[in-house]
Amino acid sequence: MKEIVFENISKSYGKTKVVNNLNLTIKEGERLIILGPSGCGKSTTLRMIAGLEEPTSGKIYMDGKCVNDVKSGDRNVAMVFQNYALFPHMTVAENITYALKVHKLPKREIDERLKQAVDMLKLNGLEDRKPKDLSGGQRQRVALARAVVKRGDFFLLDEPLSNLDAQLRGHARKELVKIHEIYKQTFIYVTHDQVEAMTVGDRIALMNKGDLQMLDTPANVYNKPRNIFTAKFIGSPATNILNINYNRGYMSIGEQKIMIPEMWRDLIDEQGNIGLSLGIRPEHIELTKEKNSDAYMGTVKYIEDYGNKYGVYFEIEGNEVIAVMDNCDLKSNDIVYFLPNFEKIHLFNRETEISIGYPKELE
């Protein structure tokens, strides 16, 4: 199987560890997104796959073979960089076909692959231009075409859309998925953009400070976050995190308490005596001005108008919380009542920051 396996991989630069004991299997033919903030180790991980960086410890397997000592040029990968890395003195066609000519493929094969890539990525009529005569979006498509024609077993993309405007990024995301559906290569795609990750990926590997935080489908990363970092990083506005106290079926925020459903009581009781944090997404909060003794009471601080929705910032016992609402008749200093949707909340161990509902075998 043409899969990639990281076995206890670490990478350090001097005393700085940028990837920490990474264990990860990238399945044959999938689109895996390596997502995370700047400095999390995602690009270093990709460069180790490409052979541009050597791991400090651990082993990398590609197609069942350890490749720690295999040179980059012998790994059968195609890579697209953030800065395109086009040869400025070559035409579009020459840039796209350069690697094919180096490997001495027959001219007919080269011409066929060039035509397919040019047609697919809408580069018709640009074949004789130099990179300086192209827009940023066109240069990006040339870089993608160059990787497509190589048809390596593994397609590596390092922040490939970060230099494009929003409209071009949306189009390019669809083109990348289309390319994958045609060639069925294994895609490993690095980005800091959660929209790209959610729309392009079959699975997301979320990293932070060199550690793998969660590996799962986009839906599960969003709806079933493994830990507080995942809950806050995925989604905008970010998930609200509030420290709570639990006692005999009641969940307290400061001096206010409400009873919680039995399913959550049983799960909390199984954890023993631990501190808890409540996580709830802004879009899963409902606010009302009607007094409700079974809800938390807060005060509206300010409201943001997003055009199609509203962001309502309110305060509960000194904690700032944001709710996203379709319609809003609230104003600053209004008293509001908030009852969590217990089917949508997340409870985390305050010390480990791991979800108490996350399957232990996946931790």
Feature annotation, model-predicted:
Residues T56-K59, E109, K209, I345:
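Conserved coupling/switch loops of ABC nucleotide-binding domains, chiefly the family-specific signature
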Residues A50:
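Helix-to-loop junction immediately C-terminal to a conserved catalytic motif
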